[in-house]
């Protein structure tokens, strides 16, 4: 099957990017060394729908090295890097992805990938799973199962599962300790500010940053904003998380009040309509809006477009400026899509090494338990988290103590 990419001539740059991340992903290298010769996925068709950049490309190559017939699609229209897609295609992996594709093209790419009749899938955000449950149900009998990378995707899976409609086993990799404690917090924290700062070239120190949502991703964004010298305000709907934010030293208030103070706004909720027409008129002139949630629904862009009294314009690459009726200008980054990928290179390599090692093990676990799992949402066994964490510590030249027999007996005494 022929790939659908921007331009195969872009491959050399993509190969360079993949070679760089390979040097900094020791866990995937270990898994590659351990299982490539055994071809543990031999002959299995696998669809990987994920933000298509160098780190994810190396995951796809590792799965291919271990015997899988891998097809890759992007999970967000603005996160695909065309040179990396070309490099993957050049290395023999079928790719259906282009940067800034239309919604129609995006859906076509997902459908083309599913035409390969996969046995295993890796999803990021839930679009692939949604298509399987809606327009491509004929493929479900062939599925062993799949895994989900993100909080947003897990929310969608939980809704399916609670309604009794989940049609095949899925593993919530996002809910693994080695994923959310590091990827969601440290990954999102660093990469979101990398995207914001490289796009705006503005100082963060001394500014007021409003972080919408105080889950693990929001904690990371707020932590890094504080470290950069910002005054941080958190908005929440959960009183427990609100208390957490206060105890972490942040002001907590409703978005309607916070809208008056923010210089930067970062949404990290996984929900829609977090910032809307109710809030835009209250904002400072020059306010910067960024979304770090999976879908472009957290900042209501349609409201912005309806309210602007002058045609919106790109004032700088990846910054669209809207003029409010009161004359104030509001700057939207990356069309309201994932700022760390639409405006940057995504999470740090070393962090994604943990997440993608978990994805690899999720595929292995599903295969090893073929026919044993119900149509349900699962988390990876704790021993796999522990194994990956131990390997990562070793790769980082760090070590921990072990319990003596006496200590073990003390802790496990009845």
What are these regions (language model features)?
Residues 50-68, 183, 187-261, 267-272:
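Glycine-rich phosphate/diphosphate-binding loop of Rossmann-like nucleotide-binding domains
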Residues 114-115, 204, 256-262, 280-284:
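A short, aliphatic-rich alpha-helical micro-motif
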């Amino acid at each position: 099957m022929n790939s659908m990419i921007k331009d195969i001539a872009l491959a050399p740059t993509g190969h360079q990017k993949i070679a760089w991340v390979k040097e900094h992903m020791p866990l995937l290298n270990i898994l590659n060394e351990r299982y490539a010769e055994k071809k543990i996925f031999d002959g299995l068709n696998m669809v990987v729908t994920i933000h298509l950049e160098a780190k994810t490309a190396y995951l796809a190559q590792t799965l291919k090295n271990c015997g899988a017939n891998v097809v890759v699609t992007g999970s967000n229209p603005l996160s695909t890097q065309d040179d990396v897609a070309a490099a993957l295609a050049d290395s023999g992996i079928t790719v259906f992805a282009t940067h800034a594709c239309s919604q129609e093209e995006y859906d076509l790419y997902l459908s083309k990938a599913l035409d390969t009749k996969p046995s295993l899938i890796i999803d990021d955000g839930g679009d692939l799973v949604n298509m399987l449950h809606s327009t491509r149900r004929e493929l479900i009998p062939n599925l062993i199962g799949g895994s989900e990378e993100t909080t947003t995707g897990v929310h969608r899976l939980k809704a399916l599962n609670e309604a009794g409609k989940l049609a095949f086993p899925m593993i919530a990799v996002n809910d693994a300790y080695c994923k959310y404690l590091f990827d969601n917090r440290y990954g999102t924290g660093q990469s979101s500010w990398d995207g914001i700062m490289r796009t705006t070239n503005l100082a963060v120190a001394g500014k007021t940053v409003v972080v919408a949502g105080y889950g693990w991703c929001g904690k990371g964004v707020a932590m890094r904003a504080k470290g950069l010298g910002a005054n941080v305000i958190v908005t929440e709907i959960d009183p427990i998380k609100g208390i957490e934010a206060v105890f972490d030293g942040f002001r907590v208030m409703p978005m309607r009040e916070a809208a008056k103070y923010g210089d930067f706004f970062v949404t990290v909720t996984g929900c829609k309509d977090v910032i809307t027409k109710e809030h835009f008129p209250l904002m400072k002139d020059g306010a910067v809006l960024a979304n770090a949630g999976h879908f472009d629904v957290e900042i209501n862009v349609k409201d912005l477009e309806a309210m602007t009294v002058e045609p919106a314009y790109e004032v700088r690459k990846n910054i669209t400026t809207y003029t409010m009726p009161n004359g104030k200008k509001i700057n939207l980054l990356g069309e309201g899509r994932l700022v760390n990928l639409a405006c940057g290179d995504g999470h740090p390599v070393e962090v994604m090494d943990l997440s993608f090692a978990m994805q690899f093990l999720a595929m292995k676990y599903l295969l090893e338990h073929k026919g044993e799992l119900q149509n349900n949402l699962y988390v990876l066994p704790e021993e796999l988290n522990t194994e990956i964490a131990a390997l990562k510590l070793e790769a980082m030249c760090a070590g921990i103590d072990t319990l003596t027999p006496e200590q073990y007996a003390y802790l496990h005494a009845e």
